[in-house]
Regions:
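Short, well-structured hydrophobic secondary-structure segments
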Residues: 45-51
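Hydrophobic ligand-binding cavity/cleft-lining segments
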Residues: 1-44, 98, 145, 156-167
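Alpha-helix boundary/capping detector
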Residues: 30, 39-43, 75, 92, ...
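Hydrophobic-ligand binding "helix-grip"
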Residues: 24-25, 32, 37-39, 52-102, ...
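Terminal "cap-and-tail" regions of soluble proteins that handle hydrophobic small molecules
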Residues: 3-6, 95-167
Length: 167
């Protein structure tokens, strides 16, 4: 589980991550995104999305189911089809006392192709940082910062349990 504090409101970050149609606008690896089913009402429900990605010489497509729960500030993504044998990720957004957000992000994946798996394993940490960085940069464009730049959120870390990494 990657855990970080971002100086944006949890509702704004939930909105950003749930806005999958705009991923190609700010995540350079995603070249296209198409929502094939949308059963979301008032931030609750699920949608299916087909993504096209490109990294160096690799071009792939995959489909995921995105489950949104705005009241809980939770997003879960599960794999439907494509080059993986598994893909899942979770986002949890926790409000801190100054209005900023403690973000918990967890991802698990495995490619069917062992060469692709080996390539991604070598850069796993870098890939996660890239993804988080893309969302953080887009949040900076869309939303104004909240909270204190030097907030000590040590106590909040004790109060907010780390989500389990099992799917």
């Amino acid at each position: 589980v990657e855990r970080m504090r971002l100086r944006y409101r949890p509702e704004d970050l939930f909105e950003l991550v749930s806005d999958v149609r705009r991923y190609p606008d700010f995540i350079k690896l995603i070249t296209a995104m198409r929502v094939t089913r949308d059963a979301v009402v008032d931030g609750v429900g699920e949608l299916d999305a087909e993504a096209r990605v490109r990294y160096k010489f690799v071009r792939e497509g995959f489909t995921t189911r995105v489950m949104l729960d705005a009241p809980s500030l939770a997003i879960d993504v599960t794999y439907l089809s494509g080059p993986f044998h598994e893909l899942a990720n979770r986002w949890r957004f926790h409000r801190l006392e100054d209005g900023s957000t403690l973000v918990d992000f967890w991802i698990r994946y495995g490619f069917k192709n062992p060469v692709l798996q080996m390539m991604l394993d070598g850069g796993r940490t870098r890939a996660i940082r890239y993804l988080i960085g893309a969302f953080e940069a887009e949040a900076a464009k869309r939303f104004g910062p909240v909270g204190e730049s030097d907030l000590d959120y040590t106590e909040a870390l004790k109060r907010i349990p780390t989500p389990e990494a099992s799917a």
